Amino acid sequence: MVQQRHVLLITYPAQGHINPALQFAQRLLRMGIQVTLATSVYALSRMKKSSGSTPKGLTFATFSDGYDDGFRPKGVDHTEYMSSLAKQGSNTLRNVINTSADQGCPVTCLVYTLLLPWAATVARECHIPSALLWIQPVAVMDIYYYYFRGYEDDVKNNSNDPTWSIQFPGLPSMKAKDLPSFILPSSDNIYSFALPTFKKQLETLDEEERPKVLVNTFDALEPQALKAIESYNLIAIGPLTPSAFLDGKDPSETSFSGDLFQKSKDYKEWLNSRPAGSVVYVSFGSLLTLPKQQMEEIARGLLKSGRPFLWVIRAKENGEEEKEEDRLICMEELEEQGMIVPWCSQIEVLTHPSLGCFVTHCGWNSTLETLVCGVPVVAFPHWTDQGTNAKLIEDVWETGVRVVPNEDGTVESDEIKRCIETVMDDGEKGVELKRNAKKWKELAREAMQEDGSSDKNLKAFVEDAGKGYQAESN
C-alpha cells in the first residue's frame, strides 16, 4: 500500500514566517498532499481571531514556546525566549509526530522555517526527512554561510569604515549598510540571540549530506546566489504569494489568510476613489516600531509630496491606549490628504489600480510582493535582512530607490519627498523603475506557472521527499 504523503510544516510564530508557510501549505494541498501546519499556541489563537479564512483541507497543530498566553518582550530576554522555545517546542513537536503516527497518518516529511533548528534535530531522531524553508532571499543565506567560513574577521574589523566593501561568492560587492544587521557590531543586545541561532541553523544543516533548503525566491531572480553554496541543495520554489496574483490556479485565493492582526474595513473604498497610479502606500511590516522623530519626518515627507497616501500604523498591542505624546503633530493634515489604518491586506493594496509606489521596510515578503505586483518602491530598510534586500532592489533588480539617512540615522522629510517624486514622476528614472518592475512581475509569474521553474522545482522536491521517507522507514 502506498503511504499517503503527510508534510508537517513548522513555523516560527511571527507574521513574516506564517504568511509564506501558509502559501507553501496551499501549494502542497493543491498537489494532493496532506499538510499539518504547526505554530505556537498563542500565534494560532491570534490567527483564528482574525477575519481571514484558512486554506481548505489544512490541519493545524500547536507547539508550546513556554509562553502560551503570549510573549511580552519587556523584562524577558529574547535569548531566554529562544531557549524556552527550543526546549518546550522540541517536546511538544515529538508529541505531534507520535500522535499522527498513532492515528494512522504518520508524518513523511518535516519542513520548518528559520530560527527553528531544533525542529530538524527532532525530525532526525524520529527518522523523518526534513527540509528548511528559507523565507529570506538566498543572498542572505549565502552571506551567513560565508560569514562563518572565513569572512567574519573582515566584517568585524572593517564594517565601521564607510569606504569598506566586501564581496561574498555569488553576490555583488556590498557595503556595511547592505549586510544583515545581525552580523554587524552593534550596541543593541535585544537581538543578540539571532546570530548564534543562524550559526546553529547552518551547523544543523551541515550534519546532513546535501541538505534540502527550500527558498522563497525564483531562479531568474537570484541565479548566481542559488549556485553559491555547493554543499546545500538550494531549491527555489517562490514567490510564495497568493495564487490569484501569480499562477491563477486558485482565483479565489486573494490574501494570505493567516493574519495575526485585525484588518481595517474601509481602505478599499478609499482606494477606489483615487486616480490610477496616484497613491503612495506606506508600511513597515508587522514587527518594526519606528522612533517618534522618524514618524514625524515620514508624516512631513508625505505631506510635502502632495500625493494621496495609505499609511499603515499598527495599533498598540495588548489593549494599550495611545498616549497624547505618541500622536503625530500634523494628524489633521494627514487625514485630509491620505488615510491611516492599523492593518490591511497588503497584496490587495499592491494590486489596486490606484497604487503608484510603496514606501517599504524591505522585509522579504513585502519585497517579493512588490515584484509579483510590479510596483516600484522607496526602500526604507532598518534591520535584519532589509539592508540586503534594499541593495538588491536598488542596484540589481533596479525597481526602486533607497533613502539616505542623515548622520543621526534619521531619514528626513525632504529625502522622503525626493524619493517618492523620483519613483512617481514620469522622468527618466521613474520610467525606468516602472519598466523594470513590470519585467520582474512577468518573470515572477512565469516561475509559478505550470511547468515554470518554481513549479517544476517544487514537484521534484515532493517526489524526492517521498523517496526519502521510504528509505528512512525501511
From Swiss-Prot:
It catalyses: crocetin + UDP-alpha-D-glucose = beta-D-glucosyl crocetin + UDP; beta-D-glucosyl crocetin + UDP-alpha-D-glucose = bis(beta-D-glucosyl) crocetin + UDP; beta-D-gentiobiosyl crocetin + UDP-alpha-D-glucose = beta-D-gentiobiosyl beta-D-glucosyl crocetin + UDP. InterPro entries: UDP_glucos_trans (IPR002213), UDP_glycos_trans_CS (IPR035595). Ubiquitous. It is found in: Plastid, Chloroplast. It is an enzyme of class 2 (transferase). UDP-alpha-D-glucose binds at Q346, H361, W364, N365, S366, E369, D385, Q386. An anthocyanidin binds at H17. Residues 1-45 form a transit peptide. One of its GO terms (cellular component) is chloroplast. Crocin is a yellow pigment that accumulates during fruit development. No other crocetin glucosyl esters detected in neither flowers, leaves, nor stems. No correlation between mRNA expression and pigment accumulation. Belongs to the UDP-glycosyltransferase family. This is Crocetin glucosyltransferase, chloroplastic. It comes from Gardenia jasminoides. The lineage of its organism: Eukaryota, Viridiplantae, Streptophyta, Embryophyta, Tracheophyta. The gene is UGT75L6.
